[in-house]
């Protein structure tokens, strides 16, 4: 059943297309070959989408040879969600009649408002090109970060020095001196100025001593250590041919040797001929004794403070906080003053009277 009289602007399907110009003279529609709708069961009649308004808005020509777009329902996927409006445009100025269960549907909404409503109601899928560009940018950033980290790791080489590097360092020091280590490090791959300086002063200097330590050197080390402590740079200045690193390594090696002997329960406290070992042993014993005294002092002070706090609380509250003791309350002394009344005498001190609010 058709209810064409309900909407006057809805054209009749059986009417002549030329009559549409009379009903809507401003938006005239030129006749063209009809293409069946994609959903013929809904009874929606297709009409060309080449009116004057759309020609102005979408730059669509009225040439009959140009492909036209017809009013067809939006494609519906299996989940019941409409696609976006990429392939079909709604001819909002040309009404159509959908004979679905006797209903008449008219399209008179502006194109812009209709597009905004549709975009808000449904999830419009994002273009794949934009996703590809975003993914490519993230991949590029990851590659740049990986290359940057890789370069930072390659800046400082932690490997051992090779004989070739030692020879090159000796030649560069002879030509540039011992003050411009940054410039010297540029000649090495994966080395910095600090590494070149330490390598030169600790291993490659011509006047450096690599032989065993003598008793005179140990005695100088002991005397200077008594004054400056573990300042190896100051000690190395008093020992010609011994670098800061060599002095520190000699000290630590002697300590490890004493520790290993003590671990093996050998005669660790027997007198030694080495003066440095005896000195380090005495320092270790004195440090341990001093540490024990400090610990004992801290423990004693804490116990004194705890006892003092308990005494203060006992004096104020007349209570002993120790769990094994009980509160002592003096017994009442009963004195009889006659057969009519009895008077109780109860000895108490000032603290007990104060706690009970007695005057």
From Swiss-Prot:
Disruption phenotype: Single and myb118 myb115 double mutants do not show apparent developmental abnormalities. The endosperm oil of double mutant myb115 myb118 lacks omega-7 fatty acids. Residues 1-17 have a biased composition (Polar residues). It holds the Pfam family Myb_DNA-bind_6. Induction: Induced by LEC2 but repressed by MYB118. PROSITE patterns: HTH_MYB (PS51294). GO terms for biological process: endosperm development; fatty acid homeostasis; positive regulation of DNA-templated transcription; positive regulation of fatty acid biosynthetic process; positive regulation of unsaturated fatty acid biosynthetic process; regulation of DNA-templated transcription; regulation of endosperm development; regulation of glucosinolate biosynthetic process. InterPro entries: Homeodomain-like_sf, Myb_dom, MYB_TF, SANT/Myb. SUPFAM superfamilies: Homeodomain-like. Accumulates in reproductive organs (e.g. flowers and siliques). Expressed at very low levels in vegetative organs. This is Transcription factor MYB115. It comes from Arabidopsis thaliana (Mouse-ear cress). The gene is MYB115.
